[in-house]
Amino acid sequence: MQKRILCYAIACLFSLDVLSQYIYEANQSLIDLTNQSGTTSLNAADDQVSSVFNLGFTFDFYGEAFTQGRIATNGCLHFKTTGAYCSDFTPDPLASQYTYTLLPFWTDLIRDNDSSMLAKSFSDKTVFGWYDMREYNRASDNSFEVILWTNDTFE
């Protein structure tokens, strides 16, 4: 019985370690707004929220209609008026204040000189992008995007 419990405990610890190493890879390449015309810079200082960006259409998110959003350095897209909590990343469980928020890569990100936070509206979508953002205490950069489609879906 003790051997069975020990084996189960080791298997659980191994499983947790494997899960903590998970990397998400999207099904498509980045649209990459960095060299496109008509792109709006939403660069914000470290741990700050950008100015408001108009989506160019009404986006229904959990029963509420939105026409604008703002992004934060730490990988947050928020649809309400301030979204100030998006600027303060903590690894704690998410509270109810994160309603009407997408967290595509919620971590402590640093915007260096080569980094950019951009947005652009197209006829069928709006793209918010974080490019070459460095994680706190890490050397490598991350680039990711959120796409809001006019049919009220996102990826």
For each predicted feature, which ranges?
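Cleavable N-terminal signal peptides
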Residues: 8, 18-19
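Von Willebrand factor type D
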Residues: 21-155
